Regions:
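Crotonase-fold acyl-CoA enzyme core
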Residues: 106-222, 249-262, 268, 275
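Conserved CoA-thioester-binding segment of acyl-CoA-metabolizing enzymes
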Residues: 1-56, 70
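Charged catalytic carboxylate motif
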Residues: 30-34, 100, 107, 206, ...
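Short, charged, surface-exposed hinge/linker loops at domain edges
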Residues: 226-235
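Localized chelating/binding microdomains
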Residues: 93, 151, 233, 247
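Glycine- (often His-adjacent) and acidic-residue-rich active-site loop
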Residues: 55-107, 153
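Terminal peptide-recognition signature
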Residues: 16, 20, 34-35, 53, ...
Length: 275
């Protein structure tokens, strides 16, 4: 059984399902590699116009695989004993983790098309970070969220310390990291962590309907919106206005923009191609 399922749908939505239900989709090495490969394929494939990410079974993602962590720690210790310079071992392990971050959370956050996390259950630790990387979070009423890192004596990874404060504020983010409190779907909606809460049995249906609506839209413009929004997270207003002006003019020259103008004049709905 593969750790990640991948489906390209006729409506332009790619559905990626984390598929280790017996462990609440905890992140094995294989899962991280496959997820990164499928996200890269989605980014390259123009036929994919929206990406949906969910989990099989009762959980979205329970974060890192603790058994795998123990094995890696043992291997790291052995490698450290074999090498004269333990800093080299740390550098290698750090670089490997960074590659995992780039292939997953960063790609979800930056790819030039909408990404939607359909959170069906628990999303904690790196699993929380992963769903925060998506543009939009639609969650089951049974979803639960937490940072969890304190419980295993770790500081956090997969971009959570960057993304969480931008959604819930720095004070609440610090509290969530320091306490590892688990919050339910209603609380997550209240504090701005998620966008929508739906009935558990309707999550996939309603989530994919939402994704299909995005996929039928001007996805090239969505990509430029994301570029502006991401740039604005760290830029000055002056710099962002330059960026907006440039991308606005580029968007105005696009096939989709010209189609939208024609459709308006002809009193019909536009048929966007994502270009």
């Amino acid at each position: 059984m593969t750790d990640v399922l991948f489906e390209k749908r006729a409506d332009g939505v790619a559905l990626i399902t984390l598929n280790r239900p017996d462990s609440l989709n905890a992140m094995s090495d294989e899962l991280v590699v496959l997820l990164g490969e499928y996200l890269e394929e989605c980014e390259r494939d123009r036929a994919v116009r929206c990406v949906a990410l969910t989990g099989a079974g009762r959980g979205f993602c329970a974060g890192g695989d603790v058994r795998g962590m123990q094995s890696r720690n043992e291997q790291s210790g052995e490698a450290g004993q074999e090498r004269s310079n333990p800093v080299t071992v740390l550098d290698r392990l750090t670089a490997g983790l960074r590659r995992s971050h780039d292939a997953t959370t960063l790609r979800l956050h930056t790819m030039a098309k909408p990404t939607v996390a359909l959170v069906n259950g628990v999303a904690v630790g790196a699993g929380l970070s992963l769903c925060l990387g998506a543009d939009i979070r639609i969650v089951s009423e049974r979803a639960r969220f937490g940072t969890a890192f304190r419980n295993v004596g770790l500081s956090g990874d997969f971009g959570g310390t960057y993304l969480l404060p931008r959604l819930v504020g720095m004070g609440r983010a610090r509290e969530m990291y320091f306490t590892a409190e688990i919050i339910d779907a209603a609380k997550a909606l209240e504090i701005g962590l998620v966008n929508r809460v739906v009935a558990h049995d309707e999550l996939l249906t309603r989530g994919l309907e939402f994704c299909a609506k995005l996929a039928s839209g001007p996805t090239a413009a969505f990509g430029r919106m994301k570029e502006n929004l991401n740039f604005g997270e760290t830029a000055t207003l002056d710099a962002l206005l330059d960026q907006e002006a440039l991308l606005m003019r580029i968007s105005g020259l696009s096939v989709d923009s010209r189609e939208a103008v024609r459709a308006f004049m002809e009193k019909r709905e536009p048929e966007f191609q994502g270009i």
